[in-house]
């Protein structure tokens, strides 16, 4: 992109074109106003640090993990998405035992 040419340097092949003036800085009226103070932000609450060995039940996330673990045991649907009758019966019996 070509640089702006100063109005003093209007000689040459682009001498007939007028160049834009540099934009002026803030007007005196705006610079006279004081900047409004920023509102203080509330300090964030810090959570209590837990020991690394303790486990916390996470609700829905925990259920997903249980399903993944069950899938590793061989009760998950087969690769193409179809379930076998034996696998369906196993999952039903596991769900009944859990209740």
Swiss-Prot record:
Residues 1-25, 39-53, 83-99 have a biased composition (Basic and acidic residues). Pfam families: HMG14_17. Keywords: Chromatin regulator, DNA-binding, Nucleus, Phosphoprotein. GO terms for molecular function: chromatin binding; nucleosomal DNA binding. Disruption phenotype: Mice are viable and fertile. Mice have a mild diabetic phenotype and lower plasma glucagon levels. The overall shape of the islets, the location of the alpha cells in the mantle of the pancreatic islets or proliferation of pancreatic alpha cells are not affected. It is found in: Nucleus. One of its GO terms (cellular component) is nucleus. GO terms for biological process: chromatin organization; positive regulation of transcription by RNA polymerase II; regulation of insulin secretion involved in cellular response to glucose stimulus; regulation of transcription by RNA polymerase II; transcription by RNA polymerase II. The modification Phosphothreonine is found at residue 10. It comes from the Eukaryota. Residues 1-99 are annotated as: Disordered. InterPro entries: HMGN_fam. The modification Phosphoserine is found at residues 6, 78, 93. Binds to nucleosomes, regulating chromatin structure and consequently, chromatin-dependent processes such as transcription, DNA replication and DNA repair. Affects both insulin and glucagon levels and modulates the expression of pancreatic genes involved in insulin secretion. Regulates the expression of the glucose transporter SLC2A2 by binding specifically to its promoter region and recruiting PDX1 and additional transcription factors. Belongs to the HMGN family. PANTHER family: HIGH MOBILITY GROUP NUCLEOSOME-BINDING DOMAIN-CONTAINING PROTEIN 3 (PTHR23087:SF2), NONHISTONE CHROMOSOMAL PROTEIN HMG (PTHR23087). Interacts with the ligand binding domain of the thyroid receptor (TR) (in vitro). Requires the presence of thyroid hormone for its interaction. Interacts with transcriptional regulator SEHBP. Interacts with nucleosomes. This is High mobility group nucleosome-binding domain-containing protein 3. The gene is Hmgn3.
